[in-house]
Amino acid sequence: MRLYDDELKIYYEIKEAQGDTYIVISDADKKLNGIDIPEEIEGRPVRHIAKKAFLGCKGLRHVSIPGTVRSVGEWAFAFCDNLTRVEMQRGRIELGKGVFKNDLNLREMDVYDEGTEEPDRIMVSHLMAAAPVIMDAEYLLDTLHCGEDEWLGKWDTKLSHILSLKDNDGYHLYVLCGEEDFHFDYEEYLEYNREKKSSLCMLRLVNDIALKEEDKEPLRDYLRDHTSGCESEAAIRMLLKRHGDDRDYYRMMLDIGAINDGNLEAVLNMMGDRHAQMKAYLIEECGKKKADFFDDLLL
């Protein structure tokens, strides 16, 4: 029998197997804007989130999944357009196929435990969120080993593979088979892939946990080759689209020379009347760099 929790705004079922009585969350109010799933409902542990339970909850922004949950079904949180943050306790959770499909605004997937340093945990949460959304790499949704050296190596290997692909890779399949979520002509398809690569390069350089110096340079090169003034300005477009007011990303782009005195005006024009604080920051920092340059000449 399906029951409804008026406070949580979810539907659930009470199941029993091998002497264990537990809760399965089966559906949710589509107007839900956030939920901290409890460890127990009616004194019974929440063990499973069913297939498509939160599918299409357009207003859902954050989800917290307790450590009692053992599995999350296919497409459970798919097409949640505004989902930005997911919290899960570190442990072995079975995540179904397409569990976060098309959640394009997902930015953090925080897998927490008591032993992880806060800065590392934050960086890993950003890398985890990119796995299903940008990288199409659901095998990286490893809630037990994420953040470990081997997992980070797999993440970086996937990034290297993505960067090695030609921008038109897969276009013939896209044309033949179609893709319900995207509609591109050839040039738009090329730019889409450049934007994806730029976004991942920025993400990894800012969240540089265990990233070796020699592995940073190809990422920097890619961003410098796709900044304002280049044939493709994908890096600046994604900077503004995904990180419009995040100073850490602007600082990184300044540090690597992807934003500089030569293209500052063009970048500011692309920003239009948005991101006023970041515009002021860029103007100030480029001014400092110019002053430092002339000071060095006088020495």
Region spans (language model):
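Ankyrin-repeat intra-repeat helix-capping/turn positions
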Residues: 244-245, 274
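Charge-dense, extended regions
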Residues: 252, 257-258, 266-299
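Short amphipathic alpha-helical interaction segments
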Residues: 71, 245-248
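Structural signature of tandem-repeat unit edges
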Residues: 2-23, 29-48, 58-71, 81-94, ...
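Short amphipathic alpha-helical segments and helix-helix/interface helices
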Residues: 96-100, 250, 279
